[in-house]
Swiss-Prot record:
InterPro entries: PPE-PPW_C, PPE_dom, PPE_sf. Residues 521-536 have a biased composition (Basic and acidic residues). Belongs to the mycobacterial PPE family. Residues 501-536 are annotated as: Disordered. One of its GO terms (biological process) is response to host immune response. It comes from the Bacteria. This is Uncharacterized PPE family protein PPE3. Pfam families: PPE (PF00823), PPE-PPW (PF18878). Was identified as a high-confidence drug target.
Length: 536
């Protein structure tokens, strides 16, 4: 609610008195009253007409059907007459509230007079003689401020309540025969029936969201007084709202019948599939044919979905294919782990004889292998071996591969399968074993250190056969005269003494006086006996 106390009374009085006044509101109330009277007159005329039909020459089933078809319209006329009369009363209430507010509001003339009197009292307030009248004038202005704010608050509350309680007029229902609802549908399912509290809640939400433009009657199965079957234009948004409500009610009916009578439930469902849903699909197709843009969008979505379906169908076809049968390989006889060298060339006579003479000390199976130098007989025609699709035969057993599965940079050499290679590997293993045995006998400590227990006197002279090197002396050039003022500078600079070793022991017999540079006078007296010229 607006905070009316925040504004002075001049603002409220000016806004309230400068408007069009209650004339427009009273005019609207008069129109609603005349509309209510017109509805009542039409209802009375229709009642007389229906009575005449029932009692006249049209008496019979046709007259009864005529009266039954006009019954919803007659009820709507009576309800509309009452609604219009109530709306007129609400407008009159708002007009009365406005008139009361104008009468209770302080006028601009009264407010101007209060301000004028206040200025005069303040101007003639000599020695405080107008203090009491000024206080009374200010109190009267505060009263008018409060009165204006309360008047506006009361007027707002009454007007908002009247507008909020004004009823809404529903659209007029069509005048149709009782069997007209079956023209579009060839089934007899009802969209009304036993309404639930949830249905009324949904109906109220629809009415609030649409601003009173969607009035669903769950008991009668109508939208804005029109049956669901009469909405046939799928291009209108209300068609989709009606279809959503219809499908939800159909599903609710199916579930209820499923627990009571499953046979009737499935019969109801098949009726929907055969008659109701195809009708709505035809309505959608008609709406799309009237809008080419919507038709293009719908066809695009359908084509994309069909493409996905065909793709899955192809995958399902692949699932039914049987893999090609691969002939089983002929079993290969197991070879011994260590093959003799003579088995590499069984078809060569001369090398085979030489190797046979060299392998004489070998075992009996090796000798029999060497002796069989003739080629092996061809395989039987019925046992077909595995064929290679290349003109060159694959490598034989023992052929090394050039590829390596190791992650190291060094490439592994193919392992030889000869006796010489086996002997070389055994020799390498023996050498490694002997090296490990020798390493075990050695002592290896990581914390050992060298003992320097030999005294050597340094020789600072030049090497034999070479000229002596000039010893290091202090330079006589540099920053100039340094020291205190009045002190004498020594020109003679002594040589560096170098490293000096002093004899002594650990019991206090060593030197106690620190060494000083050679340029210092060792015979110098105590500091108290120095000459005056040597100090600053």
């Amino acid at each position: 609610m607006t905070l009316w106390m925040a504004s002075p009374p001049e603002v409220h009085s000016a806004l309230l008195s400068s408007g069009p006044g209650p004339g427009s509101v009273l005019s609207a109330a008069g129109v609603w009253s005349s509309l209510s009277a017109e509805y009542a007159a039409v209802a009375d005329e229709l009642i007389g007409l229906l009575g005449a039909v029932q009692t006249g020459a049209w008496q019979g089933p046709s007259a009864a059907a005529y009266v039954a078809a006009h019954a919803p319209y007659l009820a709507w006329l009576m309800r509309a007459s009452e609604t219009s009369a109530e709306a007129a009363a609400r407008h009159e209430t708002v007009a009365a509230a406005y008139t009361t507010a104008v009468a209770a509001m302080p006028t601009l003339v009264e407010l101007a007079a209060n301000h004028t009197l206040h200025g005069v009292l303040v101007a003639t307030n000599f020695f405080g003689i107008n203090t009491i009248p000024i206080a009374l004038n200010e109190a009267d202005y505060a009263r008018m401020w409060t009165q204006a704010a309360s008047t506006m608050a009361t007027y707002q509350a009454v007007a908002e309540a009247a507008v909020a309680s004004a009823p809404q007029t529903t659209p007029a229902p069509p005048i149709l025969a009782a069997e007209a609802a079956d023209d579009d549908h060839d089934h007899d399912h009802d969209h009304g029936g036993e309404p639930t509290p949830l249905d009324y809640l949904v109906a109220e939400i629809l009415r609030i969201i649409s601003g009173g433009r969607l009035i669903w009657d769950p008991a009668e199965g109508t939208m804005n007084g029109i049956p669901f079957e009469d909405y046939t234009d799928a291009a209108q948004p209300i068609w989709w709202v009606v279809r959503a409500i219809e499908f939800s009610k159909d599903f609710e009916t199916f579930v209820q019948e499923l627990f009571v009578n499953p046979v009737e439930a499935f019969q109801f469902y098949f009726e929907l599939l055969l008659f109701d849903y195809p009708t709505h699909i035809v309505q959608i197709v008609e709406a799309l044919s009237q809008s080419p843009q919507l038709l293009a969008v719908a066809l695009g979505s359908v084509i994309s979905n069909l493409g996905a379906v065909t793709g899955f169908a192809g995958l399902s076809g692949l699932a039914g294919m049987q893999p090609a049968a691969i002939p089983a390989l002929a079993p290969v006889a197991a070879a011994p782990s260590t093959l003799p060298a003579v088995a590499m060339a069984p078809t060569m006579a001369a090398p085979g004889a030489a190797v046979a003479s060299a392998a004489a000390p070998a075992s009996a199976p090796a000798a029999s292998t060497v002796a069989s130098a003739t080629p092996a007989p061809p395989p039987a025609p019925g046992a077909a071996g595995f064929g290679y699709p290349y003109a060159i035969a694959p490598p034989g057993i023992g052929f090394g591969s050039g590829m390596s599965a190791s992650a190291s940079a060094q490439r592994k050499a193919p392992q030889p399968d000869s006796a010489a290679a086996a002997a070389a590997a055994a020799a390498v293993r023996d050498q490694a074993r002997a090296r490990r045995r020798r390493r075990v006998t050695r002592r290896g400590y990581g914390d050992e250190f060298m003992d320097m227990n030999i005294d050597v006197d340094p020789d600072w002279g030049p090497p034999p056969g070479e000229d002596p090197v000039t010893s290091t002396v202090a330079s006589d050039r540099g920053a100039g005269h340094l020291g205190f003022a009045g002190t004498a500078r020594r020109e003679a600079v002594a040589d560096a003494a170098g490293m000096t070793t002093l004899a002594g022991d650990d019991f206090g017999d060593g030197p106690t006086t620190p060494m000083v540079p050679g340029s210092w006078d060792p015979d110098r007296d105590a500091p108290g006996s120095a000459e005056p010229g040597d100090r600053g």
